[in-house]
Swiss-Prot record:
PANTHER family on file: HOMEOBOX PROTEIN ONECUT, TRANSCRIPTION FACTOR ONECUT
Pfam families, per database record: CUT, Homeodomain
Annotated protein name in UniProt: Homeobox protein onecut
Single GO BP term: regulation of transcription by RNA polymerase II
Disordered, as annotated region: 274-326, 481-504, 653-688, 844-875, 978-1081
SUPFAM superfamilies found in the cross-reference section: Homeodomain-like, lambda repressor-like DNA-binding domains
Compositional bias per record (Acidic residues), positions renumbered to this chain: 278-301, 1047-1056
GO cellular component terms listed in the entry, alphabetical order: nucleus
Length: 1081
């Protein structure tokens, strides 16, 4: 397969980019009004038309008033072919599409040939080069890119991830009419992060009204040929879905081949194409929505503008590559790998920060129409919507940083899943897994068999090996901005930016609907949802035409216009939250003993009665094994939850963002069927915090069930980051069935744990512990390790010198554990100590006087939530909420109280403690004869070998380097000691010889029988004897320095030394016995 380097002439770009700039991306022309007439491809001169002429299709005429930075009208498909750039700032290596196709003598698709004639007739005024390349300094796999953020006009950063080629293009343009473009990305077997600099070219992701799906994949020749065939049928909307399927399958096979050939992808093609609106699906809507067909067309226009706003607001895209599989550009059912507008990438942290799963899986007709199409600037644009027979042909914008493959769709039964959207803001980096490496999202092909047969099988799992449908409101940068700019039918204003209070975005979660669901709001503010899994027809329309991003919409059965029919409006400040909900299958109910009636609703903002609610900053942490609730009183139609989940959602904590109270008016719509609403929301905080119940609000107009919001506030007594299970939140019950919200304010109900055990008498406690240990003969080491998770020395010091409670900070936890241990029954204390070290994690709550939380609900059933740890050792569930039920009417739904028992375990310290358990002593190392002789020979040559030499010696002899180093160190010490011993012995022998001479001389003087000559001879003989006795010892001084004399007990030198010692025994003993000076020497 030819790479793009073979297709593209590297030397033509720098000139043609400036000369034919209007052919590529024309941003400097004045607003144009294209006619609706469709033009057929003409001659070869059309190849040099402008970019609008090259890749576009006739669009519906629409009046647009450009304000702010300007935009372009029409539904244009932009093709950006990105390849290795040169080393210069202005040099690149690609041509425009028609020239490439001309050089290769290949026919152009209709999408490149067809365009209104008026674009060519209208003169274009390009004052400057419309394309500005950000400085390219960083060489990345043949591509040079630099994020020049210092420039004032370059307001965005560039993000390069994992060896991907990318091109940062910024349009320098004057006023434009609205340009609405959808960007699809084809990447080959590479995870990529591409920041597309979109400043004035606001409309990058949009639906084209009446414009069919066009895509030109310039990855290789095969795809171009495929595109030709695809372009022929692209203008027949009714034939298009089947053509898309065929084209998608061919393209997948081609990309799989290309992934094998190209490795990390020599080519990166950014295909910007617009999708059709699937009007025929709109007609199949079973909602009885008479306005559906008419509004769908307008909705696509407004949705396109809303996405244009979203993109222009964030102006940051990230390319998606999923498991060497690339979704075809025209394949609307699995529009998967696309560009996602997000905030600038933050520095990569140790943990993947935030990850919002989003997708739209619809088993039936789903018509979500937005009449006025005011897309409030959100960071994520209706991510990953996969429609089966849906009228939502809205574009998918998704990111997945792992190897993910969109599942194969067979005909109209599309079982593909929605992409994973990662809203990334500063301080948040969305990665597939916690560690941030390539996450093989558990294979998406499995999802086809799991979701397709019944469209209600909605399978989502959490990355922490648990079953969960996770939603991250990535609110620090996904702040829902509600601009009140009601758009007229053709106008598009950019004045929503001031309305974005924090300029952030607001993420949305899932919509699971089974049956017909038409959701209309009172205020008509539509929260655009991502996970829309509908088994039947679902039409979401607004009355007031303001589109929003709403959280989990789960409905089952007929759901008429929820104007005031009990829809709980979730208003939330854009803080970090996790909204988790999923129907509970029967097996999970049996496992967790959850009543099939109303479940707990935790951390749900109040109903619409008060729209100025704030949620405390909460870090989203995917719970371990959490319970969701059944959405019906019966278990019929429950979404099945299996253990082998295909979708992995990674949720990790991030530091809390700054809060802005002015965003509090933002509403998040959480809907369900009017009479059947049981939801289970868990909200967990990264930091240890007590749970505060606050602002409980009844339902609205007919569903008086209560919703209690639980805040998390200041830290309380925690064990290793876990909140103690005795800390229970006292929840203010809400009793009023009226529309008003009964709020108790921020009622900070602290927990008994921290308050009861304040001011512990540490001295008395230490004495009692010492007495107990002596009474039962409990070793301090066992007690310290198994109960306190401390060492024996620490316990001994604490018992001997306990500090006053007021002077303790982190050390209070140890005394708390002592105190709890004393409060336990005697048999429990002893059993805790007898447990094996391997059972310490299960024993820790018992020894701490805790038990895993189980609270009985109104039906008497208990719900338990086991806790777990993330791979980084941080707490997974650190919340201990207890919600109270409020029965305001017979129809009200009781809220089951759930106690999450926090495990106060010393798991972090256990592992080192277990490793520090006494181990059997290592056997004494004995050198073999070869090793010993080799080491001694080397020591004779060099007393201090270098580290490298020691390593070499150890490798040659099969020893450890430390062993070799110890040998040489010991050899030096022993040689010095031997030298000193031998030197002292020789000195003593010389002195003793002189003493013998003196004595003999005295004896000779007294003996007159001996002559003078005999005395002289005797002295001479004595001197000769002395010299003979000194010679071997002078030799010993040198041999003592050698390893033979130093180490070897078996060597010959040692035998010689022993013979010398034997020779010196009698004189030494004689000298010691006779001469007192001998002892001194």
């Amino acid at each position: 397969m030819d790479s793009l380097n073979d297709i593209i002439d590297h030397q033509t770009f720098s000139q043609e980019l400036v000369e034919d700039a209007s052919e590529f991306i024309t941003v400097g022309h004045h607003s144009e009004r294209p006619s609706q007439s469709s033009q057929q491809p003409n001659s070869g001169q059309d190849l040099t038309m402008s970019m609008q002429d090259i890749i576009s299709c006739p669009v519906k005429h629409r009046t647009c008033s450009a304000s702010g930075s300007g935009s372009a009208s029409g539904s244009d498909s932009v093709v950006m072919v990105i390849d290795a750039l040169g080393q210069g700032n202005r040099q690149s290596a690609y041509q425009i599409v028609p020239q490439q196709l001309q050089q290769r003598n290949m026919p152009l698709p209709f999408g490149l040939l067809e365009r209104d004639r008026q674009h060519m007739q209208h003169g274009r005024e390009v004052n400057t080069s419309p394309v500005d390349f950000v400085s390219s300094d960083i060489n990345l796999d043949g591509l040079t890119v630099d994020a020049d953020v210092s420039q004032t006009d370059h307001s965005q950063e560039t993000a390069v991830k994992q060896e991907q080629k990318l091109l940062i293009v910024q349009s320098k343009s004057q006023d434009q009419s609205h340009r609405r473009i959808r960007m699809l990305v084809d990447v080959s077997s590479v995870n990529s992060g591409l920041g597309v600099h979109v400043d004035d070219m606001d409309e990058i992701s949009s639906d084209g009204v009446g414009c069919d799906d066009e895509g030109v994949t310039l990855s290789h020749q095969h795809l171009l040929e495929q595109e030709e065939q695809f372009g022929l049928t692209s203008h027949h909307p009714h034939l298009q879905p089947h053509t898309q399927i065929i084209h998608g399958l061919h393209q997948r096979s081609t990309h799989s081949e290309m992934g094998l050939d190209n490795g990390h992808g020599e080519v990166l093609s950014v295909i910007v194409h617009s999708q059709d609106s699937d009007k025929e699906d709109c007609e199949e809507n079973d909602d009885g929505d008479a306005e559906g067909d008419l509004e769908n067309e307008d909705d696509d226009e407004r949705d396109s503008r809303s996405r244009e706003q979203l993109l222009s607001h964030s102006s940051y895209q990230t390319l998606t590559s999923v498991n060497d599989r690339l979704s075809s550009p025209g394949f609307s059912q699995t529009s998967y790998a696309t560009l996602t507008p997000i905030q600038p990438l933050p520095p990569i942290s140790t943990m993947s920060e935030k990850f919002a799963y989003s997708g739209h899986i619809s088993g039936g007709d789903s018509g979500d129409t937005d009449v006025n199409g005011d897309g409030a600037g959100g960071g994520v644009v209706e991510v990953g919507e996969v429609t089966n027979q849906s009228s939502e042909a809205t574009g998918t914008v998704s990111i997945s940083s792992g190897n993910a493959t969109s599942s194969v769709c067979s005909n109209n039964d599309c079982s593909s899943f929605s992409a994973l959207s990662m809203p990334i803001g500063s301080g948040h980096l969305g990665l597939g897994v916690l560690s941030g490496v390539q996450s093989p999202f558990s294979s998406y092909e499995k999802l086809s068999s799991m979701i397709s047969p019944p469209p209600n099988n909605y399978l989502v799992s959490c990355d922490l090996h648990s079953s969960v449908s996770g939603r991250v409101i990535n609110s620090s940068h996904l702040q829902l901005s509600h601009n009140g700019n009601k758009k007229e039918s053709g106008t598009h204003e950019h004045t929503h930016r001031p309305a974005d209070v924090n300029g952030g975005k607001f993420s949305y979660t899932g919509h699971i609907s089974r049956g017909d669901s038409v959701d209309n709001d009172v205020n008509g503010e539509k929260f655009s949802f991502s996970d829309h899994i509908s088994g039947g027809d679902s039409g979401d329309e607004d009355a007031n035409r303001e589109k929003f991003i709403y959280s989990d919409h789960i409905s089952e059965g007929e759901n008429g216009p929820d104007v005031n029919s009990g829809t709980n409006w979730l208003q939330m400040h854009s803080e970090r939250e996790v909204r988790l909900h999923m129907p509970v299958p029967a097996e999970l109910e049996a496992r967790f003993h959850i009543s099939s009636e109303r479940r707990t609703r935790l951390n749900v903002p109040p109903a619409r009665g008060s729209l100025s609610r704030h949620l405390a900053p909460n870090a989203p942490i995917c719970p371990a094994d959490w319970k969701a609730d059944d959405w019906k009183h019966s278990n019929a139609g429950v979404v099945s939850l299996t253990a082998d989940m295909p979708v992995v959602v990674s949720l990790t904590p991030t530091p809390p963002p700054l809060r802005d109270d002015s965003v509090s008016g933002i509403k998040q719509n959480e809907r369900s069927s009017p009479g059947h609403r049981e939801q289970y929301f868990l909200d967990k905080s990264q930091e240890p915090s007590s749970v505060v119940a606050d602002q409980c609000s009844p339902g609205i107009n007919g569903t008086p069930q209560s919703v209690c919001v639980i805040h998390q506030q200041s830290p309380s007594a925690l064990g290793n980051g876990f909140q103690s299970s005795s800390q229970q939140a006292k929840v203010s019950s809400c009793a009023s069935p009226k529309g008003t919200v009964s709020s108790g304010g921020a009622v900070s109900n602290r927990i008994a744990n921290s308050s009861d055990m304040e001011e512990i008498n540490t001295k008395d406690l230490a004495q009692r512990i010492s007495a107990e240990l002596k009474r039962y003969s409990i070793p301090q080491a066992i007690f310290a390790q198994r109960v306190l998770c401390r060492s024996q020395g620490t316990l001994s010091d604490l018992l001997r010198n306990p500090k006053p409670w007021s002077k303790l900070k982190s050390g209070r936890e140890t005394f708390r554990r002592m105190y709890k241990w004393l409060q336990e029954p005697e048999f429990q204390r002893m059993s805790a100590l007898r447990m094996a070290a391997a059972q310490i994690p299960q024993r820790a709550p018992l020894s701490s006087g805790m038990s895993l939380g189980s609270a009985t609900g109104p039906s008497g059933s208990t719900g338990t939530i086991p806790t777990d740890l993330d791979p980084h050792g941080g707490p997974t569930m650190i919340q201990n909420p207890l919600t109270n039920e409020s029965d305001s009417s017979p129809a009200s739904t009781p809220v089951t109280s759930v106690l999450v028992g926090s495990v106060v375990s010393c798991r972090r310290k256990e592992e080192p403690q277990i490793e520090q358990m006494p181990q059997p002593k290592k056997p004494r190392l004995v050198f073999t004869d070869l090793q010993r002789r080799t080491l001694q020979a080397i020591f004779k040559e060099t007393k201090r070998p270098s580290k490298e030499m020691q390593v070499t010696i150890a490798r040659q002899l099969g020893l450890e380097p430390t062993t070799v180093g110890n040998f040489f160190m010991n050899a030096r010490r022993r040689s010095m000691d031997k030298w000193r011993d031998d030197d002292s012995k020789s000195t003593m022998h010389v002195a003793h010889s002189r003493q013998q001479q003196d004595e003999q001389q005295k004896d000779n003087a007294h003996t007159h029988s001996q002559s003078q000559i005999q005395d002289q001879n005797h002295s001479q003989n004595q001197a000769i004897h002395n010299s003979m006795s000194q010679d071997p010892y002078s030799n010993l001084h040198t041999t003592a320095m050698s390893p033979l004399g130093a180490f070897d007990e078996d060597a010959d030198m040692d035998l010689e030394l022993e013979s010398h010692d034997f020779d010196l025994v009698d004189p030494d003993e004689h000298g010691d016995t006779n001469d007192p000076n001998g002892d001194m020497l």
